[in-house]
Amino acid sequence: MKPSLLCRPLSCFLMLLPWPLATLTSTTLWQCPPGEEPDLDPGQGTLCRPCPPGTFSAAWGSSPCQPHARCSLWRRLEAQVGMATRDTLCGDCWPGWFGPWGVPRVPCQPCSWAPLGTHGCDEWGRRARRGVEVAAGASSGGETRQPGNGTRAGGPEETAAQYAVIAIVPVFCLMGLLGILVCNLLKRKGYHCTAHKEVGPGPGGGGSGINPAYRTEDANEDTIGVLVRLITEKKENAAALEELLKEYHSKQLVQTSHRPVSKLPPAPPNVPHICPHRHHLHTVQGLASLSGPCCSRCSQKKWPEVLLSPEAVAATTPVPSLLPNPTRVPKAGAKAGRQGEITILSVGRFRVARIPEQRTSSMVSEVKTITEAGPSWGDLPDSPQPGLPPEQQALLGSGGSRTKWLKPPAENKAEENRYVVRLSESNLVI
């Protein structure tokens, strides 16, 4: 009995002895080097495979590769980039965050929560300092990453675009100002700037560059007509002229309504008809017609009265009942003209006056008559009737003479009336 009992433990020991050796051999076969992990698919024929991107295996073993540490979760900078054989090393906290220095696995907190004087925070904990990264693994030959600051520098393309914008905007502004200056200079010289090209009447379509407002449309237009046309081109002046004409017509109507009707004594049938108004000379259609008491020029109310020179007024003594007062009563507050000037047109500060020429006593009368010898009129008396006015007496011949209207001599044609255009304090003699 005793020998059999001793054999049983020995046999059990011999039976259990191969199991640790086999287990050790199988475990040693499944261990992988750093940077690799066991291959779970035995059909490939390999026991280990490289670690996938983003994972690492730092030592021998049969465990799979572990993922790299994410420093962003802890609000820290990467001090060392992870590889297949080492993990990522986290450094200091982000700018604006604080945490224990030298402990990369502890998450950082915002500087707004930090007390005064906390390391890594300044200006009441809202601006991060430029930290120094902790370089580790110098023996392993890993590359280190320089710490960054909180400012983001733009690329070279963005900087070039900013410089281009800064250079182009002033150029466009200067070009616009230069164009405005050129237009003002051209307007001073008489040109006018337009956005489109004007086609002139010539074959080439080009104009002379003169303002059309200063061109004389009619070659026979006199100076006063040109001045009136230039004045009436503006709306303000045209309105003022209309008011002046209305006032003139109203005064004429008032004068004619209150004027006593004067009848001329009956004249001989051969005497030419004379206008009873005697406000003007019959130079347009000759003598007045015999159709009515008023000539064709009187029927047109647009003709003004003839303003005689002071010498002619002094020489002639018109009948008070027949001739109206040719001078206009100046308005209250109106500026008096110079001595000898007769105002023809006055609109605001613009005034057209006539300067009579200084003639000798022999050149006083404006209408000259000559007598020629001829057959006497039987029905006319030898001497002018004493009851006739001076104008009819000038038309009637005395002692068998004939009266003719003659044109002034050639030298008198060259003599023209001078006019003064007065605007404010400056005078322009025409």
UniProtKB/Swiss-Prot annotation:
Spleen, lymph node, brain, breast and peripheral blood leukocytes (at protein level). Expressed highly in bone marrow and fetal liver. Very low levels in skeletal muscle, testis and colon. Not detected in kidney and pancreas. Phosphorylated in vitro by OXSR1. Phosphorylated by STK39. Residues 134-143 have a biased composition (Low complexity). It comes from Homo sapiens. It holds the Pfam family RELT. The chain crosses the membrane at residues 163-183. Glycans are attached at residue 149. Residues 26-162 are extracellular. Interacts with TRAF1. Interacts with RELL1, RELL2 and OXSR1. Interacts with PLSCR1. Interacts with STK39. PANTHER family: TUMOR NECROSIS FACTOR RECEPTOR SUPERFAMILY MEMBER 19L. GO terms for cellular component: cytosol; nucleolus; nucleoplasm; perinuclear region of cytoplasm; plasma membrane. The modification Phosphothreonine is found at residue 223. The lineage of its organism: Eukaryota, Metazoa, Chordata, Craniata, Vertebrata. This is Tumor necrosis factor receptor superfamily member 19L. GO terms for biological process: amelogenesis; apoptotic process. Keywords: Amelogenesis imperfecta, Apoptosis, Cell membrane, Cytoplasm, Disease variant, Disulfide bond, Glycoprotein, Membrane, Phosphoprotein, Receptor, Signal, Transmembrane, Transmembrane helix.
